[in-house]
Amino acid sequence: MEIQQTHRKINRPLVSLALVGALVSITPQQSHAAFFTTVIIPAIVGGIATGAAVGTVSGLLGWGLKQAEEANKTPDKPDKVWRIQAGKGFNEFPNKEYDLYKSLLSSKIDGGWDWGNAARHYWVKDGQWNKLEVDMQNAVGTYNLSGLINFTGGDLDVNMQKATLRLGQFNGNSFTSYKDSADRTTRVDFNAKNILIDNFLEINNRVGSGAGRKASSTVLTLQASEGITSRENAEISLYDGATLNLASNSVKLMGNVWMGRLQYVGAYLAPSYSTINTSKVTGEVNFNHLTVGDHNAAQAGIIASNKTHIGTLDLWQSAGLNIIAPPEGGYKDKPNDKPSNTTQNNAKNDKQESSQNNSNTQVINPPNSAQKTEIQPTQVIDGPFAGGKNTVVNINRINTNADGTIRVGGFKASLTTNAAHLHIGKGGINLSNQASGRSLLVENLTGNITVDGPLRVNNQVGGYALAGSSANFEFKAGTDTKNGTATFNNDISLGRFVNLKVDAHTANFKGIDTGNGGFNTLDFSGVTNKVNINKLITASTNVAVKNFNINELVVKTNGVSVGEYTHFSEDIGSQSRINTVRLETGTRSIYSGGVKFKGGEKLVINDFYYAPWNYFDARNIKNVEITNKLAFGPQGSPWGTAKLMFNNLTLGQNAVMDYSQFSNLTIQGDFVNNQGTINYLVRGGQVATLNVGNAAAMFFSNNVDSATGFYQPLMKINSAQDLIKNKEHVLLKAKIIGYGNVSAGTDSIANVNLIEQFKERLALYNNNNRMDICVVRNTDDIKACGTAIGNQSMVNNPENYKYLEGKAWKNIGISKTANGSKISVHYLGNSTPTENGGNTTNLPTNTTNKVRFASYALIKNAPFARYSATPNLVAINQHDFGTIESVFELANRSNDIDTLYANSGAQGRDLLQTLLIDSHDAGYARTMIDATSANEITKQLNTATTTLNNIASLEHKTSGLQTLSLSNAMILNSRLVNLSRRHTNHIDSFAKRLQALKDQRFASLESAAEVLYQFAPKYEKPTNVWANAIGGTSLNSGGNASLYGTSAGVDAYLNGEVEAIVGGFGSYGYSSFSNQANSLNSGANNTNFGVYSRIFANQHEFDFEAQGALGSDQSSLNFKSALLRDLNQSYNYLAYSAATRASYGYDFAFFRNALVLKPSVGVSYNHLGSTNFKSNSNQKVALKNGASSQHLFNASANVEARYYYGDTSYFYMNAGVLQEFANFGSSNAVSLNTFKVNATRNPLNTHARVMMGGELKLAKEVFLNLGFVYLHNLISNIGHFASNLGMRYSF
């Protein structure tokens, strides 16, 4: 029977809404649809399996899909099974191409005309209830199957695992089912080496127009040992009830794969269900283009492998795609069922009842199963399972397609998976929107979601929707685990009525822009941990979010939103922060806008820039804190009113708040100025009053501006010269105002001293010149003072005011009021300095360079200070401001400066300067010095400098490596002593010795013994493996250092042309150090490795050794003193060393070589080094730099005594002197802010060393050894001790 061999595609009728009413009765099989939605998809996601194992291939996939295929009916059993076996001729030509249908299939496939559908179709010989099995397992070559269209059953099984199958060379193929009362399922299975799809492939399509007989269900299985591929024009279509199983090393489908495709008019009235199973694909599955839905609510499932890639995913407006990733470890095979319960086994039994005819085709009659009771597999229902940690679903672009159908609530398309990672690429997402609205849900039940591309509406970034027809993007990460992260790496721009909803544990956004007209909703209320947004632009936007970090919030009005606000409609919690808030300028009051908050515990804002016709309403937030700046943002913009509303407001340390009539700031609760500065802008001769609804607190410190010498002000009036004179200007009013000095730890409402201190922090400026106090050092200062107070005479004739030089002058024309309810200034006009008019204080002279200074700090004897006041702001002392000496002098402790230098030296002074001034300020230094005596200061500084010098020392940093190297030197010497034996007492192989002496003459007995020694154990068992436990300690007064670890190696005695010992070793040791004050603690992991050898020439011994070492040190500083607490930190670095050694010795042997005395001399080279420190401290005194390197050259002289007894035992002692004769190196000074510690080292060291050890035989070829070594530095008087205990095995 011929099949069509021409290129063609089946024409699909367009869906016509006019025909809906006439075709409502034409719907897919209802029982199948219901079972798929209520059992199969939930079963796969929920983990349904059979037998004992959940998540098994044979259970979850095999049984679950089998039930989907058969749709709640009894299993299909063929009436007949036809078998075809390919002859040997098909096994001979691997490069030959065959027509599969003509060559093998045609004899057992019938065809005919389907009058109901007006199309031709094909079936297994004698009817769709039969089966055809084709055995081609040894066939080779390429087999083309083209034009087998409308194959309606029964089952077809083709095994051609050594050949290539090419589907659709000239025409496509379609495999479908024949619906009758039995609702049979067609199963088609191709098993090949490679499968190539060149043309369209349809699964479970209706025959012809589809107007007649419906299809039941079809399962197509393509299995290839190497790969499955399709061309770009090869479209694969899965209709309702279709299942496609793919099993291979890799799958790459370049053509469109269409799941849930329609064929007949009106089919969109009911959903369709289709499945692709790729769980048996070991590599990546690649869909170039995947389409789900064809004007219908298609539901599709992909049972995925570990990695699934989809180039473009097209979803119909109501379609859903479920991608089910395998669990950790993959799907596991379930135990075999009993043979009587499997259809496969029934087929096997059928074969036993078959007979064979002469045409090599078997006709098999099925057994009579009428008396058998069929037992269905057990259904085990478990909860959802997560995809394995390496499971990934990559989709470059997602599109949704829509038509003009209107439905209340709109339509929603969905993508759901359980993979560990769902990644949407740079193609982004496009949502096609129509009337009544459209939505897209992207959900990862147990993992993360990452989106790299933009979000589009109707193919436009920033595309908009219409009121009542909103476009909605919805993302859910970790729905079941509550631990997923949703990350958006591209800027998101949303037009009007476009909404975004994200549910996750953590959500990260690069940028979100809803300022293109507004009326958007950003619903992040389902984020349980933190929402992080780099930049958020809003306009009339509803933002539902709690606990967020927003780097920049820009609030627009756009001149279109009348009274519309950006509304944070959820309680924002206690951990929300905005780095920068920018309110953009509105056009006029009718088009004003702003932002308001429903509620929250606390909001922290770093920078806040407000603008006219834009409002900020945070009255429902309990506390708002400004940490850097609150300022009028736009420059050159039209003046207008901004309205800022708070409940409780805090101005943080060093923060600045600009305030004017246009600020319109409302604080209905409390206001705290915690060492910030309020800048008042004078307009129209007045300043705006900051009104506080309840209480205000003014907290200040003793910190001084190093540039001017003045205290850092809490309030500044800029352009104060423009103030209306003889008028009280109220700066702040509250029910209660309190004052506090955080440096002194005091606060009060009515404390006079605190109020006077506060007044010194209320400053008036004319441009950059302070008006209330002038400091005069020279004529330039006289001019600046004249400019500040408006005295033109001082500007033009400064020489007339030279009597002010060296003085600080106070302008008594300015009075300040601070009490429990009001802070104000009264500007009477500037006073004029006179030569004897008072109100001046002399500036001190620096005795070193005779120059007067304008630095300011605290003293009590200012002539214009109140008697009961605490120290006021006046000129100070003989030392430069900003030095530790100036602080001592301010505290009337000038003598302690000499004590500091005498007991701690310049290094101690510099360290104190760094700790108190350079890392903090003069106020902090004064507080610390006032609390500490001079003796205690020098004691603590000496402790710190000793510790820091120790830290910088390369000897300290490499001490662990040196102790480990010393331990190994002892072990290696013991090994060389052992293998240098020339003495033995007992001869085990005496016959061998006698045979060697046959016909020999000797001048002495010793000469004969030399022959016997050739059969000593070191010759018979020349190779040794050894391991030792090692321990060591350093003996010095500076602290406790110890090391413990293990060393192992292998060596051998070589007795060829050159008599030698060669060996290698590796070791590990953990070293620790703690100084006596317990302020420095270290722990290091050290490794040492190297090679060693000895060459013999009669009684001459030449030793060579090379080794390297590396240590990773983790240390911490733990000072208990408050003065030194900033030094406390943890830090780490790497230490390393390399060494080579060569020596020569001569053996003097006694008692037949039992006793050997060996003097020796040698030279060695050591390279020691360390890397820079890496500190975890965020203090200014964090340790930095510190890398150092040293090259050492040494000469040594040693004497060694060895005593050998028995065949294997020995004892030795070695003593010697090691003298450095040259060293050089480099060092990068350890730095702590401005303080530096340079490493110091003794010029040339001399060491004395003694070591001893021995070995005993425990059992045949097993030995125990023990050793000790002591090394003493005769220059630094530091000793090092090490010991070892180990085992040796010879072979």
From Swiss-Prot:
One Pfam short name: VacA
Domain Autotransporter as annotated: residue spans: 1018-1291
Keyword Membrane: yes
Signal peptide stretch: 1-33
Region (Disordered): 326-374
GO-annotated molecular function: toxin activity
Alphabetical keyword list: Cell outer membrane, Membrane, Periplasm, Secreted, Signal, Toxin, Transmembrane, Transmembrane beta strand, Virulence
GO cellular component: cell outer membrane; cell surface; extracellular region; periplasmic space
Stored SUPFAM superfamilies: Autotransporter (SSF103515)
Disulfide partners: none
Source organism, top-level taxon: Bacteria
Ranges of compositional bias, category Polar residues: 338-347, 354-374
InterPro entries according to UniProt: Autotransporte_beta (IPR005546), Autotransporte_beta_dom_sf (IPR036709), OM_autotransptr_brl_dom (IPR006315), Vacuolating_cytotoxin (IPR003842)
The protein's role, per its UniProt record: Induces vacuolation of eukaryotic cells. Causes ulceration and gastric lesions.
Domain notes: The signal peptide, cleaved at the inner membrane, guides the autotransporter protein to the periplasmic space. Then, insertion of the C-terminal translocator domain in the outer membrane forms a hydrophilic pore for the translocation of the passenger domain to the bacterial cell surface, with subsequent cleavage.
Protein name, as recorded: Vacuolating cytotoxin autotransporter
